[in-house]
Curated annotation (Swiss-Prot):
GO terms for molecular function: 4-alpha-hydroxytetrahydrobiopterin dehydratase activity. It holds the Pfam family Pterin_4a. Its EC number is 4.2.1.96. One of its GO terms (biological process) is tetrahydrobiopterin biosynthetic process. It is an enzyme of class 4 (lyase). It comes from the Bacteria. It catalyses: (4aS,6R)-4a-hydroxy-L-erythro-5,6,7,8-tetrahydrobiopterin = (6R)-L-erythro-6,7-dihydrobiopterin + H2O. This is Putative pterin-4-alpha-carbinolamine dehydratase.
Length: 118
């Protein structure tokens, strides 16, 4: 388990500070399989996970949903046959917060033991 995945999420408000450029460079190194996507006026973390079939993809989607519910921080999830796209960003503040990187690391942990991964 990575230190980032073990970190605690904090309550996030609309006026919470977004990660700085320096923090962004440091944190993205801890989740190297994630991409930073710029959408409109904000950045998001995104990764595609491949599975052998829809059933495995759906089970992974539900597992990500469960960890999101535990901390009250929710991603965008797109479930397709054999593929799940997970996108983390802090909706309230329209950008990236440390919580997004923590949850991306936790998503990677789930993926490491997910059934049916390609």
């Amino acid at each position: 388990m990575t230190a980032l995945a073990q970190a605690q999420c904090e309550a996030c408000r609309a006026d919470a500070p977004k990660v700085s450029d320096e923090e962004l460079a440091e944190l993205i190194r801890e989740i190297p399989d994630w991409n930073i996507e710029v959408r409109g006026d904000h950045m998001e973390l995104e990764r595609v996970f491949l599975f052998r079939n829809f059933r495995h993809a759906l089970a992974f989607t539900n597992a990500v949903g469960a960890i999101a519910e535990e901390v009250g921080h929710h991603p965008a999830l797109l479930t397709e046959w054999g593929k799940v796209t997970v996108t983390w960003w802090s909706h309230e503040m329209r950008g990236l917060h440390r919580n997004d990187f923590i949850m991306a690391a936790r998503t990677d942990q789930l993926a490491a033991s997910a059934e049916g991964r390609k």
